[in-house]
A protein has these predicted regions:
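Long, C-terminal-biased catalytic regions of enzyme "large/alpha" subunits
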Residues: 1-100
Length: 100
């Protein structure tokens, strides 16, 4: 899959480590939420991850290092804007489990 060009190259993890940004991880997390509600669609997950990247590129300048929570907030926004409410709920549950 050819993804949308991304200006963000690093993110800040919850433990303050700086790691390489991966759009694949966003697409996989969205896909896993879709699968959790019996609506798996990798192509749609990749398209939604492109929307997240577009929003990231507008919200942060290229030297920014967004926190993982900020990216997750954008994923939730995109899912809700696309009227994928069940998927958004599954994603929020997944996110909450990883926060613990």
């Amino acid at each position: 899959m050819v993804y949308t060009a991304n200006k963000i190259i690093q993110i800040r993890k919850r433990d303050d480590r700086i790691v390489e940004f991966s759009q694949d991880k966003i697409a996989k997390a969205i896909f896993n939420a879709m699968r959790a509600v019996a609506e798996p669609d990798m192509e749609k997950a990749e398209t939604l991850s492109d929307q997240v990247i577009e929003r990231l590129n507008r919200k942060f300048h290229e030297r920014s290092i967004p926190a993982v929570e900020e990216i997750q907030d954008l994923v939730e926004e995109i899912l809700i804007e696309n009227k994928l409410i069940k998927v958004a709920k599954a994603y929020i549950i997944y996110r909450d489990q990883h926060n613990k």
